[in-house]
Design a protein with these regions (language model features):
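Patatin-like phospholipase
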Residues: 1-142
Length: 142
């Protein structure tokens, strides 16, 4: 419902965008890997899609009701929560690395494939590599 429409699959089951339930699917992946590879060391490199720093004015929001919270994208704020990241860090400790940073000037719309936005995405990737590249290499060096 956030980006992808609800879809019916062959057995008649209806599915919604997985980002609604697991915007950071690290915990689900870790749980499934433990089932498939019991007793094995499992490392998770979690690469985010960028943090879009949303600002909510405290003074104004104190007067909002439910409708105003939805108008100000409370779902987007909730989906960017670091709660899943914190739980993953607690469970996996040194076997978990999360890479995520500001999106900068990148347009967050998933369907913006303009040359200008693709250049911004490329620049963001290069900045992320400068910031996180060595950490990722060190982490994956098993």
């Amino acid at each position: 419902p956030i980006y992808y429409t609800t879809q019916e699959i062959d057995d008649g089951t209806w599915l919604i965008d997985g980002g609604i339930v697991a915007n950071n699917p690290s915990l689900i992946g870790y749980s499934e890997a433990r089932k498939i590879f019991p007793g094995c060391k499992i490392k998770v490199l979690s690469i985010g899609t960028g943090i879009n720093r949303r600002k909510i004015n405290g003074r104004n929001s104190a007067k909002w009701g439910a409708l105003n919270w939805f108008r100000h994208d409370i779902l987007g704020v909730m989906l960017e929560s670091s709660m899943f990241d914190e739980i993953a860090r607690d469970l996996m400790a040194k076997d978990y690395l999360r890479i995520n940073s500001s999106t900068g000037l990148v347009n967050r719309r998933m369907d913006d494939t303009s040359d200008a936005n693709l250049k911004r995405i490329h620049l963001m990737g290069m900045e992320w590599w400068s910031e996180f590249g060595q950490d990722a290499i060190d982490f994956l060096n098993v």
